[in-house]
């Protein structure tokens, strides 16, 4: 049985032993942080080193294999210099969805503004809207049905950030966001949990309409 606390303790200890003072940061992300994980969920860990090489990746992979649950291991590792040059648009999302385990993440990120957060939402909104419309036109009905709920899961992060911009409150957990979000957002959040045999036309129209309204909402924030 998987024990998250033991796994994190083992991972931190092994990384400290392998990288020493070069280990600047470790953080937990994803479904285990949100309390939404199941037995086979990815274990998302973020790692920042002072200097980063291919050899460091080999070492980190070896550590992950040695402590177990390698197939579930996931996340991101990079160097301090790369992190300082990271896209400003992603800074808010990173800070709000990462729990510090070793070090403080904000110390290694570039500065970001509210405008950056708005542009992050606009970019994400446009990408997902394009994906939705492109697939509707260029893919068959079966593929549209199969992938629709996956797109709805990605919309969670959009609504999470849009709600933050509109209310000032970043809500990490899906269940809590459903309770706090506007009715139109709540309806879309529930689309990801539709059962097999759902009414695709009705669900697609709901999501398509939500996207169009979301573009107008983000414009009002500027």
Q: Which functions belong to the PLM regions below?
A:
Residues 1-27, 181:
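Helical scaffold of the NTase/Pol beta-like nucleotidyltransferase catalytic core
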Residues 30-61, 74-77:
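Catalytic metal-binding acidic patch
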Residues 21, 38-40, 86:
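A generic fold-level signal
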Residues 16-17, 34-36, 144:
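Short, flexible, glycine/charge-rich loop motifs used to bind or transfer phosphoryl groups or to couple energy/partner
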Residues 111-222:
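Conserved nucleotidyltransferase catalytic core and NTase-mimicking acidic/glycine-rich helix/loop elements
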Residues 3, 7, 56, 206:
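Soluble or luminal CAZymes and related metallo-dependent hydrolases
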Residues 3, 57-150:
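Conserved NTP/Mg2+-binding pocket subregion across the NTase superfamily
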Residues 11-19, 61-68, 218:
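Hydrophobic, Leu/Ile/Phe/Ala-enriched alpha-helical segments that form helix-helix packing faces
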């Amino acid at each position: 049985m998987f024990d998250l606390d033991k796994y994190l303790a083992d991972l931190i200890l092994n990384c400290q032993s392998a990288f020493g003072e070069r280990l600047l940061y470790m953080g937990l992300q994803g479904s285990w942080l949100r309390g939404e994980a199941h037995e086979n969920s990815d274990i998302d860990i973020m790692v920042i080193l002072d200097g980063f090489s291919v050899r460091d990746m080999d070492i980190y992979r070896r550590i992950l294999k040695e402590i177990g649950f390698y197939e579930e291991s996931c996340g991101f590792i990079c160097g301090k210099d790369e992190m300082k040059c990271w896209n400003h648009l992603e800074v808010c999302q990173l800070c709000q969805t990462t729990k510090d385990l070793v070090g403080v993440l904000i110390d290694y990120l570039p500065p970001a503004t509210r405008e950056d957060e708005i542009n992050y939402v606009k970019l994400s909104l446009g990408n997902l809207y394009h994906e939705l419309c492109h697939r509707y036109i260029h893919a068959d009905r079966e593929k549209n049905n199969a992938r629709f709920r996956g797109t709805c899961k990605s919309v969670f992060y959009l609504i999470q950030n849009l709600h933050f911009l509109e209310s000032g409150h970043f809500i990490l957990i899906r269940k809590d966001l459903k309770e706090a979000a506007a009715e139109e957002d709540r309806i879309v959040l529930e689309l990801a949990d539709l059962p097999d045999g759902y009414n695709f036309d009705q669900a697609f129209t709901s999501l398509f309409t939500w996207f169009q309204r979301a573009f107008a909402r983000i414009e009002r924030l500027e």
